[in-house]
Amino acid sequence: SKSFKVEPGVTYPITVGGGGAKGPVARPAGDKGSPGSNSVFSTITSAGGGYGAGGSQQPGTDGGSGGSGGGGGYDANGDGGAGNTPPVSPPQGNNGGDASSSAGAGGGGAAQAGTSTTSPAPNNANGGPGGDGSPSTISGSDVTRAGGGGGAGYGGGANPITRAQGGAGGGGQGAITNEGPHAGQKVAATAG
């Protein structure tokens, strides 16, 4: 890690940013989540998280790039967003996972990439977990931050899905809705 010399009596601007937002399950076509905002300390900037992709056969279902990338959306096999964007050393985050036709992928975390998904039986497809965040002592105690969000999933009939877990350090779970003639459950992809 790099050091930053703090001078007594000098005021330094600080902005606390955030992760990207999840993408929607249903249409309108091409809709997606929103990117996160940057964190800034004086001359040092850490990029906000990439947005989560939408699902339900929408175009543009790739996750957004950012400090960590958002997870790809299901139905259209969306790719995960690139982490560490723009590139810096040491890296500020990891890639989002790639999605299958049945389940969305997890968003990337500061310490770990989001989990990609495969295409299992259509009535039992869990989303990918989010990547774990990294521990930080900036507040004076050891706290894990910047976890990636859990991905999207589909389950119907007698095969309900299990919520995809967010990564350690604040990664959110996907929200579940019931849709369709078989009361299938779909989870909105969350961001990294």
Name each model feature, range by range:
Residues 1-192:
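Low-complexity, glycine/proline-biased repetitive segments and flexible coils/loops
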